[in-house]
Amino acid sequence: VGCEECPAHCKGKNAIPTCDDGVCNCNV
C-alpha cells in the first residue's frame, strides 16, 4: 500500500497511518 492510500488502508483499525520510505504502516 502506497503513502497516498495509507489513511484509507488504516481506517477502522484504530491505527495511525505513517509512511516510511514509501511504505505504509498502521501504528496501533
UniProtKB/Swiss-Prot annotation:
Q: Does the keyword Coiled coil apply?
A: no
Any one GO biological process: envenomation resulting in modulation of calcium channel activity in another organism
Sorted alphabetically, the Gene Ontology cellular component annotations on this record are:
extracellular region
- Domain of life, per UniProt, equals Eukaryota
Q: Which Pfam families match?
A: Toxin_6
Q: What keywords are assigned to this protein?
A: Calcium channel impairing toxin, Disulfide bond, Ion channel impairing toxin, Neurotoxin, Ryanodine-sensitive calcium-release channel impairing toxin, Secreted, Toxin
Localisation: Secreted
Q: Which InterPro entries does the protein's record reference?
A: Scorpion_toxin-like_sf, Toxin_alpha-KTx_8/9
Disulfide bridge partners, by residue number: 3-19, 6-24, 10-26
State the tissue distribution.
Answer: Expressed by the venom gland.
Instruction: List GO molecular-function terms, semicolon-separated.
Output: calcium channel regulator activity; ion channel inhibitor activity; toxin activity
* Job of this protein: Calcium channel activator. Rapidly and reversibly activates ryanodine receptor 1 (RYR1).
About its domains, the entry says: Has the structural arrangement of an alpha-helix connected to a beta-sheet by disulfide bonds (CSalpha/beta).
Protein family according to the UniProt entry: Belongs to the short scorpion toxin superfamily. Potassium channel inhibitor family. Alpha-KTx 09 subfamily.
Q: What is this protein called?
A: Potassium channel toxin alpha-KTx 9.7
Organism lineage: Eukaryota, Metazoa, Ecdysozoa, Arthropoda, Chelicerata
